[in-house]
Amino acid sequence: VGASAVVWLAEGIACDLALPPAAQADETTAELRAALGAEPVDVIVQQAETRRKKILLADMDSTMIDQECIDELADEIGVKDRVAAITARSMNGEIAFEPALRERVALLKGLDAAVVDRIVANRLTLASGGRALVQTMRANGAWTALVSGGFEVFTTRIAEMLGFQENRANRLLDLGGRFTGLVGEPILGRAAKAEALLEICARLGLTPADAIAVGDGANDLDMIRLAGTGVALHAKPTVAAQAKVRIDHADLTALLYLQGYRKEDFLQ
């Protein structure tokens, strides 16, 4: 591809290639992927001058954590397979997010709200590299926001564990300590994630070009497209194909490397 230099950000893990000024992003990406073949290596071609971002906007389920919280809630009442099937179709963009969420939440009616604590303690695992991503960007002056189509009862806890400064999500309604089967309106879905990015930019005096956004589902696409660097992380092919950046192999530290951070810059 005519690179004039190779700079290792982490030996054997991530490197920068200095490309010719005339290099075209799509063509160079295709060339590099073809050269790598089946090697588990992610490729991002971008302008070095503008890659360091001032805002991080991240999805939660299957992005900052390894699970889908609504599927774990459903498992508590024996309907996980039914709910997970709807989740998968929604993530693929086969069905609209909002009606799919209402349908799944209705199946949780009567579930003891206290189960959330048990799920957080015993079932949820933080995605690899997530804490380093949030803490390193914060230490370098970035604003970090967890924006989820999931539920506040989980995002408040996960945001605290990872160090996000802000979190937004949907409200699972409960009465007398049990879920009612209803979700608070309006629902935070695909459009609301992009709106959250615009609101945060306006508040901070920045633009979407100053942001990096990461998610894995169809409801993340508007946010991913709007951000200066939009990342589809281990996403379904239909989602990954529409993102500026796709990470199929690496963990969340890839979002630091693609901004030019070296491994020794990472905080935990």
Regions found by a protein language model. Give the residues of each.
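Non-catalytic pre-domain segments flanking phosphatase-related domains
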Residues: 1-58, 267
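Short, surface-exposed acidic
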Residues: 6, 83, 113-116
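C-terminal cap/substrate-recognition subdomain and adjoining C-terminal extension
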Residues: 30, 110, 115-268
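Fold-independent oxyanion-binding glycine-rich loops
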Residues: 47, 60-61, 67-68, 73, ...
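Active-site neighborhood of HAD-like aspartate-dependent phosphohydrolases
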Residues: 52-95, 102-103
